[in-house]
Amino acid sequence: MARSIKKGPFADKHLTKKVEDANKGNKKSVIKTWSRRSTILPDFVGHTFAVHNGRKFVPVFVTENMVGHKLGEFAPTRTFHGHSAEKKAAAAPARK
């Protein structure tokens, strides 16, 4: 279920403050955050965030297409190692 329009998008106050400070000083340093739940606002475009995925910080460069999404969507928490091709190849000749 989507968030109510009258409430507006959620972004942690400490995160918006860091972005405002970076915009005032024209700094483009990496902003480190644990706030995966924050919505990407138009002010965030052009900044790089280091989003925590539970183990390490994943760098996320924000573009215009990302506005409205959550920061956590761009820092995957699970590692996909792929399906094993050996098991399928070994099981195929056994079936007759």
Curated annotation (Swiss-Prot):
Protein S19 forms a complex with S13 that binds strongly to the 16S ribosomal RNA. Keywords: Ribonucleoprotein, Ribosomal protein, RNA-binding, rRNA-binding. Residues 1-30 are annotated as: Disordered. The keyword Electron transport does not apply. Residues 9-24 have a biased composition (Basic and acidic residues). One of its GO terms (molecular function) is rRNA binding. InterPro entries: Ribosomal_uS19, Ribosomal_uS19_bac-type, Ribosomal_uS19_CS, Ribosomal_uS19_SF. Belongs to the universal ribosomal protein uS19 family. One of its GO terms (biological process) is translation. This is Small ribosomal subunit protein uS19. GO terms for cellular component: cytoplasm; small ribosomal subunit. It comes from Anaeromyxobacter sp. (strain Fw109-5).
